[in-house]
Amino acid sequence: MAYSYTEKKRIRKDFSKLPDVMDVPYLLAIQLDSYREFLQAGASKDHFRDVGLHAAFKSVFPIISYSGNAALEYVGYRLGEPAFDVKECVLRGVTFAVPLRVKVRLIIFDKESSNKAIKDIKEQEVYMGEIPLMTENGTFVINGTERVIVSQLHRSPGVFFDHDRGKTHSSGKLLYSARIIPYRGSWLDFEFDPKDCVFVRIDRRRKLPASVLLRALGYSTEEVLNTFYTTNVFHISGEKLSLELVPQRLRGEVAVMDIHDETGKVIVEQGRRITARHINQLEKAGVKQLDVPMEYVLGRTTAKAIVHPATGEILAECNTEMTTELLIKVAKAQVVRIETLYTNDIDCGPFISDTLKIDTTSNQLEALVEIYRMMRPGEPPTKDAAETLFNNLFFSAERYDLSAVGRMKFNRRIGRTEIEGSGVLSKEDIVEVLKTLVDIRNGKGIVDDIDHLGNRRVRCVGEMAENQFRVGLVRVERAVKERLSMAESEGLMPQDLINAKPVAAAVKEFFGSSQLSQFMDQNNPLSEITHKRRVSALGPGGLTRERAGFEVRDVHPTHYGRVCPIETPEGPNIGLINSLAAYARTNQYGFLESPYRVVKEGVVSDDIVFLSAIEEADHVIAQASAAMNDKKQLIDELVAVRHLNEFTVKAPEDVTLMDVSPKQVVSVAASLIPFLEHDDANRALMGSNMQRQAVPTLRADKPLVGTGMERNVARDSGVCVVARRGGVIDSVDASRIVVRVADDEVETGEAGVDIYNLTKYTRSNQNTCINQRPLVSKGDKVQRGDIMADGPSTDMGELALGQNMRIAFMAWNGFNFEDSICLSERVVQEDRFTTIHIQELTCVARDTKLGPEEITADIPNVGEAALNKLDEAGIVYVGAEVGAGDILVGKVTPKGETQLTPEEKLLRAIFGEKASDVKDTSLRVPTGTKGTVIDVQVFTRDGVERDSRALAIEKMQLDEIRKDLNEEFRIVEGATFERLRSALNGQVVDGGAGLKKGTVITDEVLDGLEHGQWFKLRMAEDALNEQLEKAQQYIVDRRRLLDDKFEDKKRKLQQGDDLAPGVLKIVKVYLAIRRRIQPGDKMAGRHGNKGVVSVIMPVEDMPHDANGTPVDVVLNPLGVPSRMNVGQILETHLGLAAKGLGEKIDRMLEEQRKAAELRVFLTEVYNEIGGRQENLDEFTDEEILALANNLKKGVPMATPVFDGAKEREIKAMLKLADLPESGQMVLFDGRTGNKFERPVTVGYMYMLKLNHLVDDKMHARSTGSYSLVTQQPLGGKAQFGGQRFGEMEVWALEAYGAAYTLQEMLTVKSDDVNGRTKMYKNIVDGDHRMEPGMPESFNVLIKEIRSLGIDIDLETE
């Protein structure tokens, strides 16, 4: 296999047995593809597909005026260029967006002409607000903060059949219901009641009999009965009654008389139940008529009206029950034929017929009025109003839309073959749904499972943005309709008609404050990726936490390969917020698909198909680990498969598909846990969630035991710098990399140089530090896609969230009781878990009523010492070390004139005015913070003079830009002259540049000329002269282009900043805070094994092995058995082997062994023991040495989930590293030097420091703010609150009998207002007595009792 630039430097030993059939897809595709589809940015006007913005415009336009004399049509749209790039937007606190310009056409028709002749056409581009752009990493910058739009998992539109699980009626009878859910519009529900009548609800309002809806659709009673029932035909001749026999219908009935065949042979005796055998005999005998007694008809329902043959009088309406009186009437009138409905109790119930009987309406108008009354109670119905309302409910494309998905699901569910159709409902649709519902009630067909992923679909960013945009457009449409009537008379242009505000507001509201637009979790690269791949069932149009039951939250068989069964939050959102599985993607309808390999007749091919949950149900799917031979045939007699959402076994020839990878079941975070297969699911859940909270450490350290997914996460997260084009590194320093692009990758007209500016010490959303470090050195060759610089938490292009620690599982003096962690001081000394946090502090100078606030170093009543870190503009220097309470930005605010005392007047008179009319409102460092100022940004509004500091910052930024552009020009120029040199070398000159005619050009000749002189050469060949001219032109153009670029940037920097109204100046100060690990910080492994650091011990006190190597961390062995996360033990053993091998390589390097010996040993490490084979033969000796140098600290291993290292392989690795195969060693107590009595498990585990730091939580209060009503101190660190002394604490003091302590707790220390003020005064005076009064909360209690109407008073003596 080919290794990339970074992979070559450090190869991970891979234990996987299964071949990679398919690479893990790009992890952010779900976000980027969806938004690309929405914008269709690159498409030309004719090639717009009917999705996204284009579809939204087309669904609202054309807008036609009320009179019909003017229309506004949509032609197309184009997106402008963003005003600022992403970094500038973050700095300035603005939205990264592009202007949207829409071309519309106003058509005015001639009123006079009869056939609507066109009188006038005006076309114009209209500005429709800004559309936020997605950054290349799948985020949006909204008001300067990075946000992510989380995808939503909602119920797919379509029709669903369900029952109430017997909960509605006390008898436990199942009541079936059908619900038609459109993409937008009214919901339509059909439901049975306990008496088996069918009712309809629209938008969950009051229910009406379902027949009312059918009548409103124009069906008569007879048509309804014809649609839903078959009929039995009876012939009457005199006193005799005969039935046209359909033998199947008799099944299960009891014979009322003997049934004979034509020969008179009895087939069924009277009183016997008719069985399938009897029916067969009847069919054989060919009995067509059956004589039945007259009472056989009684109780049956007529299917058609019975009409008097002579007079035409209607004897009985259809749907009437046959009674004795009616029979006599019918016989009298000599009616020869009656039809009754065929119903029975088994599979053909009389539900619709019963419903028609309770229906009070008799014609279409009455039904429409009834529906109108239900929808608009209290309004007087008119015929027109009722018709309009009903038609708008389900049959108008403006109000109702099933969408393509909904139509596809609808048609499939009611058994139609075509999947396309209209977005509105038709009569037939509604009748088909009712038919299907009745069939299900009759026992034919089954109800749907709403948690099946075939019935839930994913709405991504693009779709949600489109819906929001459409909402805005519909608001615009109303306004435009009003104005269009004026346009005819007043000759308005399209621009005057369209007000873009509603659209812009709708878009802004969605991106800024929708529940699904979330502040990006930027703790580390993994948390970013996971956040973008999250799928939430909450949000608008989704579920709510309170209403979601257990079924929705549960793992469903269809989650396999689509949604991760492990990664979900603990707490109220469990199961509602999920993560996409590693290989999952959405199809065009928004259903999640998973990839499978095709299997034919037991032979596995490499063809891959993506299937949705519905499509995969009929397939027989083998696991990725199914045993195969070299010819890719399945060799087991029975293969473990999934079929019809069940796990079972089948023969190899029945298998149709096979998983592509064992890790396709889990999400990215879960696939980063080695030995996941040995962990209990609950702990694995905690493990995958806690990796997202790991804080990037000062020096990233790759995990010794990984899973091989680390590289994918680091590459796709966008925190690393990836080469856009291949080439040679021209220059590199800490903050930028310049690449001279290889010739074959340079398109014509492009510059042959790429400049990558690295992100240095920038604040992330979680206040952690984003910093990139170059990995390449000058002269290195890189390919497209190679990683050139590491970001936070990445090490040589691999994700590195924590540190490899030498750990021992042993109890140690109770310091690791209850999951506590005991650390060695060495961990702190080596800065293993030191993290850098960056805080942004903002100072805003506003224009107040009394005058402008001023940022200045001249602050009243502040000593020199406090100002020594400020410059003359009153802003702190970069690099200053500041502590709590230090001034960062000096600011004074004018204060109102107060009445002056005579003394003050005297002072005023002596010292002038300034001294006292301003107050100090400087920005100070908050309590408990100590750090270094690393950056200062100054923003000044237009028209306000910029201070010296702002100008200095601007000059520095311009120098940076100029340096970049000069560098680019230097390389472009260099490359051009190189190309010219190779073209001119050996050619003959025709004169010019001081050279004689006929001179042959050599390198020396060219070196003797200045570059400017080269263009004066006249060559003998015309082609060369042309090339020289072209080169000269190219260089001039390039210079001009770069100068324009510089001017553009300069203009942007020098224009005033767009600040909020009333704000004159904003100063942002960035503080870098270094946090070492300390007791109280939370740490965790990757297996859900979390704990709090309890003590940091000196190195000499830690347990050590026979060689004297101390351990770094001591963990409690009791944390393992009950939690069943054995993966951590296996990781510890394999980590020990990895480290041991590294030390062995280190010894070989120290002894300066030959490269050949190293090659042999490395081959043994990589290829002898299980797993993937690495081809080291293609490495040069230098590359082998470089590789060995990077392996000194440990050979990194990959043990992919469900396909990882086996126990015997771990033992073999330990043996190869000359370590005990048990993974246990004898340890000695560091304090006494005595041996511990049992060998202890020692090894290397990857530990993370989580973003729950004691510094952020530690808090103490002296006096502070109080709650308004109860007068008790507030709670929480943010409010500078106190500690709650709750009821259990009160009991504790009561149990001790500490009466006075209890009294002061409940009074002067809490809410006795007078007592606490007095106490404060007393303490100041040195008098420590207290006089407790009445606690305020007691007064509140009295008031509350009074509010119940009980007069309560305290009797005070």
Swiss-Prot record:
It catalyses: RNA(n) + a ribonucleoside 5'-triphosphate = RNA(n+1) + diphosphate. GO terms for biological process: DNA-templated transcription. GO terms for cellular component: DNA-directed RNA polymerase complex. It comes from the Bacteria. The keyword Membrane does not apply. It is an enzyme of class 2 (transferase). Disulfide bonds: none annotated. The RNAP catalytic core consists of 2 alpha, 1 beta, 1 beta' and 1 omega subunit. When a sigma factor is associated with the core the holoenzyme is formed, which can initiate transcription. Belongs to the RNA polymerase beta chain family. PANTHER family: DNA-DIRECTED RNA POLYMERASE I SUBUNIT 2 (PTHR20856). DNA-dependent RNA polymerase catalyzes the transcription of DNA into RNA using the four ribonucleoside triphosphates as substrates. This is DNA-directed RNA polymerase subunit beta. It comes from Pseudomonas putida (strain ATCC 47054 / DSM 6125 / CFBP 8728 / NCIMB 11950 / KT2440).
